[in-house]
Amino acid sequence: MVYSYSEKKRIRKDFGKRPKVLDIPYLLSIQLDSFKKFTDHDPTGERGLEAAFRSVFPIKSFSGYSELQYVSYKLGEPVFDVKECQIRGVTYSAPLRVKLRMVLFDREAAAGTVKDIKEQEVYMGDIPMMTNNGTFVINGTERVIVSQLHRSPGVFFDHDRGKTHSSGKVLYNARIIPYRGSWLDFEFDPKDALFVRIDRRRKLPATIILRALEYSTQDILDLFFERIEFKIKKDSLVMALVPDRLRGETAGYDIKDAEGALLVEAGRRITARHIKQLEKTNTTELEVPVDYIVGKYAAQDYIDEDTGEVLVTANSEITLEDLAKLSLAGIKNIDTLFINDLDHGAYIADTLRIDSTTNRLEALVEIYRMMRPGEPPTKDAAEGLFQNLFFSEERYDLSKVGRMKFNRRLEIAEDEGNGVLSKEDIVSVMKKIIEIRNGYDEVDDIDHLGNRRIRSVGEMAENQFRVGLVRVERAVRERLSLGDLNELMPQDLINAKPISAAVKEFFGSSQLSQFMDQNNPLSEVTHKRRISALGPGGLTRERAGFEVRDVHPTHYGRLCPIETPEGPNIGLINSLASFARTNSYGFLETPYRKVVDGVITDDVEYLSAIEEGRYVIAQANIEVDADGRMAEEQIACRHKGESTFMRAADVQYMDVSPQQIISVAASLIPFLEHDDANRALMGANMQRQAVPTLRADKPLVGTGIERTLAVDSGVVVAAKRGGVVDYVDASRIVVKVNEDELHAGEAGIDIYNLTKYTRSNQNTCINQRPCCSVGEPVVRGDVLADGPSTDLGDLALGQNMRIAFMPWNGYNFEDSILISERVAQEDRFTTIHIQELSCIARDTKLGSEEITADIPNVGESALSKLDESGIVYIGAEVKGGDILVGKVTPKGETQLTPEEKLLRAIFGEKASDVKDSSLRVPNSVKGTIIDVQVFTRDGVEKDKRALEIEDMHVRQARKDLGEEFKILEEGVLGRARNLLLSVGYSEAKLAEIPRKDVLIQVIDDETKQTELEQLAEQHEELKADFDKTFEIKRRKITQGDDLAPGVLKIVKVYLAVKRTIQPGDKMAGRHGNKGVISKICPVEDMPYDEEGNPVDIVLNPLGVPSRMNIGQVLEVHMGAAAKGIGNKITAMLEEQREIAELRGYIKQVYELGDDVLQRVDIDSFTDDEVVRLATNLKGGIPIATPAFDGAKEKEIKQMLALAGLPESGQLTLCDGRTGNEFERKVTVGYMYMLKLNHLVDDKMHARSTGSYSLVTQQPLGGKAQFGGQRFGEMEVWALEAYGAAYTLQEMLTVKSDDVNGRTQMYKNIVDGNHQMQPGMPESFNVLLKEIRSLGINIELDQE
């Protein structure tokens, strides 16, 4: 493999054995592609904004003499960029402008004659725009729209699994689900009649809907039944024989063939053998006794032609009297319905008998009564309602997907079709459910991913936008029908508010619009790749059963079987598998390699769950010989959702990668294949909670996906184009672009501005640091700067810690963790948290609040950190209770005491009519002020501090832009100099020409002169651009802010808190091995090895066997080897060994392992590159062991040997306190540990006195309310068990809700009288009141 200059800095040794056929696709594409489809113009008008407009427009007036037509739309540019929106707390959105055409028709002239056309561009609200990283900024906070997994539109057949009826009979049902519109259900009842429900209302006999579709009884019978023909003879009947229909019946008479030979005697069951004999003898008719027809149903009406009397009605049971009547009337032939109990049930015939309606109108009225109970039905209303339910394009849409699923399920050839239902569709569904009831077909599996589809951002936003448009449509139609349209323009007809409101509601408060989890880069990526079955139109937690939550065979390669939350949402929220994507219908598909005649090709095809069932698919880890053929005869495969063994020749596809089945979070776990699934789930979930540490440390044992994840998450800065690093400082990187990657006539400079110390959604710190130096060559995609939790472009969520598995004085009992003081001293797990505190000055009824340093009754010391405007200085160290922003609020008029009146008379009015409402630092918080932002309403005078901040921002903007301009200008001038040198100018001559005059030289070569003029023009453009950009920036900074009504000023203070690791913090490994720190132990007391090196962390060995996450032990061994190799390299560098020796050792390391694919050609590295690589490997050689394709035990032993460590991975340790050796050898090595965002500082608090609940007068609970610890029922039992009566009394009275008792208690304590007089607890009075409210009087007797 060829490595770029920056990739050579540190190469991860990969133990993967399988060739990479496909790189992991861009991880955020599910979000970005979906939203792009929404905003891009779609010429076909099938999706996005275009589809929404086309579905609602043109809007015609009720009279038909005017209409509003849609022409086109365009999205403008957002006013503020993403960062500005976050600072100002506004939404990052673009204005939507739509070109509309109003057409007026001439009332007098022929229909369709146009009288007037007006076209105008109309503003239709703002559409929130997606940032480059797949998020939305809504009101200043980053949010993610989670994709939803919902039931695909189409038709589904199911049964109740025998749960509805007490007999346990299985009742079948069918459901037609449209994309929008009413649901149509068909279901059997226990008596086998078929019923229909519309929108889950009251059920009606299914034949009612057929009658409403203009089918008569006769039509219905002909649709669903075959006929048996009988000829009436004198004493018997002759039946037309179809031998197959007799199967399973008991012969009630002798059956003879045409020659009179006996085939079946009376009383015998007719079997398949008898039927074959009948077919052989070509018997077409059979003479049967007269009573054979009794009990069968007539297939049509039989009428006496002479009198017109109906002798036998269709679907009525035939009796002997009926036969006699028919004979008398001279009717020779009679047809009956073919019905048997085995596989041709009488379901529709039975249903017709229950059906009280006889014609279309009665059926429509019945449906109307069911849908609109209590309303008097009229013919028009009934017809209109039924028409609108399933046959109107405005009210009903199956969608493209729905039609495709519908047609495929009912075996209709084409996939395309109408969005509304047809008569034939409804009949086909009824026929299919009867087929299923008759045993000819199977029910569907609703948890199959072929029946569930993904709705992503774009589609949901489009639906909301359409909802808004439909609201507008009603208003427009009314306006078109009302006033004089000659005066009006399209702008006057459209009110954009409902559209904005619908879109805003969706992005702001929909269940699927979530506050982005921004703990670390992994949590961002997983949040964007999350697939939820909850939300509008989805499931609810309470209703979802076990089957929906379970892992389904079709999840393979589509949804991760491991990563899902624990708790009530388990299985309802899933994560997209690494290689999965959605197809044009919204179904998930996964890639497979094509296998042709047992040879594996490199052709990759994506298959959806529906298509996959038809093929035989081998796993990725099958043995393959040198020619790419499968080495074994029998191959482990998947076919039709089952795992089985098949011949190599039958295999059609093969997995592309062993990591295909799991999500990115799960594929970050090394040795995942050795962990129990439950623990792997916890491991995957806990990595998302890791807090970025002060200095990121790459994992020694990784899986090789770390770089992909870090780059795709967008937290690192990756090079857009190749070139050479020209300038680097903490906040900017400048790259001079390679000549071959330039566009014509550009400066050839890329400038990357870095994010510094910004707050994330979870209050963690986002900071980017350059990881390249001037003069380094870079190629496209190289990492130039690390973000939070990344180290040289690798995701780094935690720290590599030296751990030992052994008990230590009970300090690691029950998963507790013992850590060394050195870990805290070296700031290994120190994290920075940034809190945003806001102070809002409002206009109140009594006057406006004021931000000032002049605060009543506050000492000088409390104001020491504030400036004259009353706002804290940047850089001030503050602690709990300190004032950050001084604010006073007007007080209501109160009755003044004579003393106060006197004071007022002497010192003037202002003395006491304001109260202090300053912003203070919350208790238990201590930190440094790193930034202050002041927002002032337009028209309100800015204070001194606001003007200072504004001035600073303007200066900073000028400096930044000036430097950018200088860099770009230098690029242009440099190219101009090179041009002049190429036409014969000497260096000396160039040195004499003033800098700017280089561009106005005149040269003979015409083409070169043109080039020079182009550069000069470009220089002018750059200057104009600079001035324009600066002016825009300056205007944005100095303009007033658009604040909420009644708000005059907002001050935001950013406070950075440094949190070191301490007892009570939660830590975890990557294998679900979590624990709480129990003690920070002095370094000298920690166990140490024979060389005197103490361990950092001691873990309990009992945490491994029962949890079955053995991956952590292998990780520790591999980590020990990796670190050992790093130590060896360090020793070689310190001893200044020959480079050849160093090169040889590094080469040996990279070549270790059986069949390992990775080839690192160390020989091609220069000496400098080898030394730089070795320097970066001093801390240990990073290792990749991909999931399901990782390092084997043998390879771990080889690594340990290479590091000069015992192959067992165990060392003799000594006790740090006594110096004695421990009895047994101990497993010691390096494990990657994470500090999770469950910090003891955020959880622990203690209450002295605080607020009480209003009704019960008991102390509140929880840290936010400064609450107490609940002394609950069980705690009371404990005190009762000890017989501690007085303690118990104290707990239930003066320490809780005995109001008088607790105030008296203070006095007693102050007086030194340590006694208590318990009284009546307030909650007892509440109980009395509740009993009285039930109408039972209860009085307390005073003794």
UniProtKB/Swiss-Prot annotation:
Disulphide connectivity of cysteines: none
Function: DNA-dependent RNA polymerase catalyzes the transcription of DNA into RNA using the four ribonucleoside triphosphates as substrates.
EC number: 2.7.7.6
Quaternary assembly: The RNAP catalytic core consists of 2 alpha, 1 beta, 1 beta' and 1 omega subunit. When a sigma factor is associated with the core the holoenzyme is formed, which can initiate transcription.
Entry GO MF terms: DNA binding; DNA-directed RNA polymerase activity; ribonucleoside binding
Species whose genome carries this gene: Shewanella frigidimarina (strain NCIMB 400)
Keywords on record: DNA-directed RNA polymerase, Nucleotidyltransferase, Transcription, Transferase
InterPro entries to which the protein is assigned, alphabetical: DNA-dir_RNA_pol_bsu_ext_1_sf, DNA-dir_RNA_pol_bsu_external_1, DNA-dir_RNA_pol_su2, DNA-dir_RNAP_su2_dom, DNA-dir_RNAP_su2_hyb_sf, RNA_pol_bsu_bac, RNA_pol_bsu_CS, RNA_pol_bsu_protrusion
CDD domains: RNA_pol_B_RPB2
GO cellular component: DNA-directed RNA polymerase complex
Gene: rpoB
The name this protein goes by in its record: DNA-directed RNA polymerase subunit beta
Recorded superkingdom: Bacteria
